[in-house]
Design a protein with these regions (language model features):
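Feature captures the catalytic ectodomains and active-site-proximal regions of enzymes
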Residues: 1-184
Length: 184
């Protein structure tokens, strides 16, 4: 990540370009991985990257209603896995990029003065280089010289959310890895 980062987007070390899906696909291809889009099944004897099940966007969009859609999303994930197994894939590793919080009564409101941060997200904020914050401050994974102020507990710096992520609760940080093997 860049020193003056204010958008939580990592940068490629070699070019300083913002990392994007374009670079993900390019780097996967350089390493011999396939990027499978939609219902593509690719070459089962190789390696592939598949994205499916969009709980994150659904949560941000639906907020309070999000739980109504979880079963359908999981059914879609199962269907995608079955399609890959039926196409001949022997092993599938299922991971997620982060967990999330859903609170029926809404996340409580946390406070951070606007003058301290360059980007105030729901559950964390990028601090200005000279800012002092009384709460928990952690280094950004992509650039440890960038400081991130964490909202306390399950609160958010922006009010009105029932669903969100970006904090340090167990639900947001625990990302299980599931390994599926074709029994045939």
């Amino acid at each position: 990540g860049l020193e003056d980062n204010d958008d939580f987007i990592p940068a490629l070390a070699s070019t300083q370009a913002s990392f994007s899906s374009h670079y993900l696909k390019k780097l996967l291809a350089e390493r011999g991985w396939q990027y499978l889009d939609g219902l593509e099944t690719g070459e089962p004897n190789g390696y592939a990257w598949v994205q499916t099940g969009d709980l994150d966007n659904l949560g941000h969009k639906q907020q309070l209603k999000m739980p109504q859609y979880i079963e359908q999303v999981l059914d879609d994930v199962v269907a995608r896995i079955r399609g890959l197994l039926d196409a001949g894939w022997k092993r599938i590793k299922i991971v997620t990029d982060h967990g999330w919080l859903w609170v029926p009564d809404g996340l409580p409101k946390g406070e951070i003065h606007k003058s301290l941060g360059t980007n105030r997200q729901r559950r964390c904020a990028i601090l200005k280089s000279n800012a002092q914050y009384d709460g928990l401050v952690v280094p950004w994974f992509w650039n440890p010289s960038v400081s991130i102020a964490m909202a306390p507990g399950i609160s958010g710096y922006v009010s009105g959310d029932h669903y969100n992520h970006g904090g340090l609760s167990l639900q947001e940080c625990l990302t299980p890895v599931l390994n599926v093997r074709n029994a045939q």
